[in-house]
Amino acid sequence: GDVYKRQVKSVSFPNYDSGAAMPIKMYLAGEFGKDVHDVNPYVASSMYAIDRFASFRTDWEQFYNNGGIIIADRYTTSNMVHQMVKYDDLKERTAFLDWLEDFEFQKFGLPKPDAVCLLDMPLEVSEVLMAERTGKTGGNTGDIHEGNHAYLVAVHDAYEELVKRYQWHRIPCADKAKSSQYTLRTIEEIHNDVYGVVENLLP
């Protein structure tokens, strides 16, 4: 149908090839503190927002304004979860999320997503996958977030809050078999679920 005639562009964040991402690299490498709590969410979020703004302004603003479809691999939504977990208090979390929405979508003028698909990977599976992966930012050790198990547990729990608050679409990436071991779903299966969400948005 007409969907195949629509222009589509994919973007990924952080954009490590951009000079705008340099503070993020420093942050993830632990140059501002080795613990995830050493940099408060408002400061950390500002770094990521600048990276997204630089990408938007230099790479895809005109394309987007001309009706192009943007598929983002991580976006403001990733920042929400990774920073909100630094607050235990619900009021502080809510205040931060309210601030972040205003900061990026109003002050910075970044486009608000029409839909968010959460690719939901069980924590025990994702930790195995991370152990096998060499991190983009810090060699075999990943980054300061990924080395902290308690932090990853908190992040996984926080996704539940965000799914409810923003009506995100949860896409399971693994199935639990009778043996209680998880099996990864195929790329095609995951793609079909994501496409089902997108199809409903297209005119």
What residue spans do the PLM features occupy?
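Short loop/turn elements that form and flank the Walker-type P-loop nucleotide-binding site
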Residues: 65-66, 111-112, 164
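Residues at the C-termini of beta-strands that transition into short coil/loop
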Residues: 14, 120, 174
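Short, small-residue-biased leader/transition segments that mark boundaries at the very start
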Residues: 1-4
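Conserved catalytic core of Hanks-type protein kinase domains
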Residues: 27, 50, 74, 119-120, ...
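A glycine- and Lys/Arg-enriched "phosphate-lid" helix/loop adjacent to the NTP-binding pocket
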Residues: 77-157
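Hydrophobic/aromatic beta-strand patches that form the interior of the parallel beta-sheet core
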Residues: 11, 71, 115-117, 169-171
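ATP-dependent small-molecule kinase phosphotransfer cores
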Residues: 6-108, 182
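NTP-dependent small-molecule kinase module
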Residues: 124-203
